[in-house]
């Protein structure tokens, strides 16, 4: 039996979660109707807060994997609904390996799809950065005419965000500026690029998958330190895009593409039946007890 886990960091804002993560799940269930699909939050603290607040319960990654084992599911496909391979993603990957190599659960395969920003487009690999920029620009196109688009990442230092800016500058989206709230590229550096572009009209788009109330208040709220207020103070005319990237249907399709790649890869590397394989541990991507990719 096969199962799919849709894994995000999580949020306590139910409406925003359903518009983003929920929409992706609906597409996954439609495409893979023969598989069990589960939603998990990678933040245990958010799992606890969500389950205290709402009747519809959310599982942690560990709980979902244990439940799959009880149901007899032995092939698991995990699609992280995350921008980058951050600390939560790495921790989830370690947990997945432990489940795969444990005789207690009986998993033959555990396959992990890519986060949104992974492949650079070299050596015939897909360019996730260019595809993401194209998906954003295509979705906001009607409100972005004759404007610079400012992408705000709500996070700290991630090389992926700097790479996204470089990809934009090298031609994928020359009117796009990227900055992070607590890291690099900085807001001040974004102002320098905006000054060079010469546009006085801006569209600010959150580079976050879930458009929570808290995030939108930070972007366009009446507080003096909102991104809207700071840009207006610099003399710009500012519009705010009030959606997380997870609500963008083109971004949703990129996650579906990554999930499909993980499923196809597992089919190509399908191991021999478990009873005919000696339980030998190796460092290769294909293990004697199963696979993780």
Residue ranges of each PLM-predicted region?
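Extended amphipathic ligand-handling, pore-lining, and cofactor/metal-binding catalytic surfaces
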Residues: 1-203, 208-293
